[in-house]
Amino acid sequence: MEPTSGFAEQPGPEKVESEEQEPAQWQALPVLSEQQSGAVELVLAYAAPVLDKRQTSRLLREVSAVYPLPAQPHLKRVRPSRSAGGAHSSDLLLCLAGPSAGPRSLAELLPRPAVDPRGLGTPFLVPVPARPPLTRSQFEEARAHWPTSFHEDKQVTSALAGQLFSAQARAAMQTHMERAVRAAQRAAAQGLRAVGAVVVDPASDHVLATGHDCCSEASPLLHAVMVCIDLVAQGQGRGSCDLRRHPACSFTQATATQSARAGSVRKLDEDSLPYVCTGYDLYVTREPCVMCAMALVHARIQRVFYGAPSPDGALGTRFRVHARPDLNHRFQVFRGILEDQCRQLDPDP
């Protein structure tokens, strides 16, 4: 699957159970990759003051030919001077410093006759961003060190601001998470861990499966996410779990429309059947563990919405399985839907 670089807003359903209800105060915030959410990595570079601004164009051309910086196209070669005295108007980025950074003269850095150093002052070391910024916050941090180009992903910016989803879409999201909360409450009534999950086809807003934690000594792997994936499979004529002792765990049979769409949008597994959850959304009250996150990768889920984080969570807290570049499927993750309510269900995960 092609990696997901941004977040596409989808229209809300025509009708949802709570369409007259004002959504509670919560935000669906994206869980981005480590590259998108981490601090800006800096490397040392050499720069030099441009003492004669009439030489700027020539120096830029000659230095760029010798040190083209193909791995750092985001770095601008010239910046306004930050010298308090104002003795010169700009600084020119020469080259990366490498592991043996130290004081260097122009003669050591700029080979002649390829570069005529007239017009340049004494070189100095400066930290510069090693990679292009991926979010606006990274851009603001990066340009504080050195001028940097930035190609903003408006969808990511909207998602980080909590503005990606319309009021109608938020109402639908709240309805589905409330359903997961009720499933978690049913689990607690059976003496099970209070974690609930719901799988939804976002194209129709149709609930395909509702499940909760069903773990026991005999079946320790039946986490809510694993249960829901199996229930979706049962709706497709597959699945293997016997959940008759848990009436809150239910599924609906795949419709002809869903089956037809599956054939057009889903790749096939080794049995020539479509992957179980391609194109579907999962709502779960607690952040999934590593096992469940990998199951979602294999099931080809499209998006995951979770309420409260987990100490060993694999979709943001401990790991970001959904965004690993070495996996053959990645998916979008949002956190914070009805977070307080979800946290109260299972206060000591």
From Swiss-Prot:
Offer one example of a GO biological process linked to this entry: tRNA processing
* InterPro entries xref list: CMP_dCMP_dom (IPR002125), Cytidine_deaminase-like (IPR016193)
Binding residues annotated for Zn(2+), in chain numbering: 223, 289, 292
Q: Which SUPFAM superfamilies match?
A: Cytidine deaminase-like
Q: Which part of the chain is the CMP/dCMP-type deaminase domain?
A: 171-334
Q: Which cofactor does it need?
A: Zn(2+)
Gene Ontology CC: one annotated term: cytoplasm
Ranges for region Disordered: 1-25
A GO molecular function for this record?
A: catalytic activity
* Pfam families with a match to the protein in the record: dCMP_cyt_deam_1 (PF00383)
Q: Which residues carry this modification: N-acetylmethionine?
A: 1
In terms of superkingdom, the source organism counts as Eukaryota
Q: Which UniProt keywords apply?
A: Acetylation, Metal-binding, tRNA processing, Zinc
Family, as annotated: Belongs to the cytidine and deoxycytidylate deaminase family. ADAT3 subfamily.
The protein depicted here goes by the name Probable inactive tRNA-specific adenosine deaminase-like protein 3
Q: What is the lineage of its organism?
A: Eukaryota, Metazoa, Chordata, Craniata, Vertebrata
Gene giving rise to this polypeptide: Adat3
